[in-house]
């Protein structure tokens, strides 16, 4: 989208789930797209080099949501907050809306997925896990700054994670209302 910009913004590097590197063509695609394997040491190196890092705190569980769950958020991990604290990096929350419409999953085949090296295989109403044309919207919130070192007690970290989760949920709700043409 920024190809023709005179001064394009910094590229946000994504973190791909570890299982993707086991898939023949997917790992090639993610590498060419500038993604890194989702390992804490990769994330820390990128942030210490002042690179932008895009993280989905729901992890792979967030991609396994069924169609009727598409507007909900599953439990967030805590690693992203610990890493932000350790590297003194602000967290910029964003809401990503529309993926549930692009891949309307009605069931996940977990056992079959494990047989082929994936966490699950999504099943859609048309059987194949191929995306439909859909409008995907990404809206960003204001940076969130947290104080600490990343070695805080789990209860303190969970409180910070919950603040981020609530902000992302609010951004997603605002984005859905805008998409539906509802007044804010």
Predicted features, each with a name:
Residues 1-49, 60-73:
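Catalytic core of membrane glycerolipid acyltransferases/transacylases, capturing the structured
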Residues 45-184:
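Non-catalytic C-terminal accessory region of glycerolipid acyltransferases
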């Amino acid at each position: 989208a920024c190809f023709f910009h005179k001064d394009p913004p910094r590229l946000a590097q994504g973190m791909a789930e570890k299982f993707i590197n086991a898939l023949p063509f997917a790992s090639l695609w993610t590498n060419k797209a500038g993604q890194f394997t989702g390992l804490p040491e990769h994330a820390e190196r990128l942030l210490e080099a002042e690179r932008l890092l895009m993280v989905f705190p729901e992890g792979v569980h967030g991609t396994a949501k069924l169609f009727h769950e598409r507007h909900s958020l599953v439990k967030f991990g805590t690693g992203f907050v610990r890493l932000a604290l350790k590297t003194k990096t602000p967290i910029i929350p964003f809401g990503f809306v529309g993926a549930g419409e692009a891949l309307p999953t009605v069931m996940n085949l977990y056992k079959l997925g494990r047989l082929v090296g994936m966490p699950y295989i999504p099943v859609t109403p048309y059987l194949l896990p191929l995306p439909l044309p859909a409008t995907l919207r990404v809206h960003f919130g204001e940076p969130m700054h947290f104080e600490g070192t990343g070695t805080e007690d789990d209860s303190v970290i969970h409180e910070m994670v919950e603040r981020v989760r609530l902000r992302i949920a609010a951004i997603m709700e605002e984005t859905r209302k805008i998409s539906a043409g509802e007044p804010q």
